[in-house]
Amino acid sequence: MSYYDIDAILTDAEPLKAGTKVNLPLWLAEMLAIANTGDVEGKSFVSFDLPPAMGNDVVQALKADPRAVPLRDHSAHFYGLAIHMMELSEEQELAAALRKTFITRASEVALHAQGPEQDATGRWISIDLIHIDLTRARRLGQLGSRPSNRGLGSASPIPEHCAPHMTKNDELRPLQPADTEVGELLLSLHIELSHPTPTMFSRSDPT
């Protein structure tokens, strides 16, 4: 927003009306979605739409065959996003589909991790980063049981461009907030109630 952009300044100062749709980063939308600041007791003043990665078409495809859905094409942090959505939503169908997907794909990844390194490199692009962690943990367990003088720097089976959050040592470093982009994803919110919006959204113009 430019300092001299009058339209942007006025837009920033105007209160939001009921039915307004806005796109906000997930970290901000999440706080607003769980905040109970509405006039109606027990009801938040906003509602949210599930992101496209959690849309009905994706859920139905996961229910049909979890292994056939390229999760990474929808979101590199698919399960991280799903965890946030499940904390905000009570969609039982989504929860069941995600549980089935994780179990089915995790077992396939575990089997795939036993194969040669060159057979795995072509498949990383379609799996979630959590599954990459599981595969690396599986490989580390196998390497730890073999007598070898090589360090993991030369034995790591995962291409660096597919696992930027991993380190070349004997331990797995957990994902850090800076490693993920989940918090920057946009979530659509709807202002549901007709009461004035809180001061955190707008300020009254001086009269």
From Swiss-Prot:
One of its GO terms (biological process) is mitotic DNA replication initiation. It holds the Pfam family Sld5. One of its GO terms (cellular component) is GINS complex. Residues 142-171 are annotated as: Disordered. Belongs to the GINS3/PSF3 family. This is DNA replication complex GINS protein PSF3. It comes from Chaetomium globosum (strain ATCC 6205 / CBS 148.51 / DSM 1962 / NBRC 6347 / NRRL 1970). The GINS complex plays an essential role in the initiation of DNA replication. It comes from the Eukaryota. Its main location: nucleus. Component of the GINS complex which is a heterotetramer of SLD5, PSF1, PSF2 and PSF3. Keywords: DNA replication, Nucleus. It is found in: Nucleus. SUPFAM superfamilies: GINS helical bundle-like, PriA/YqbF domain.
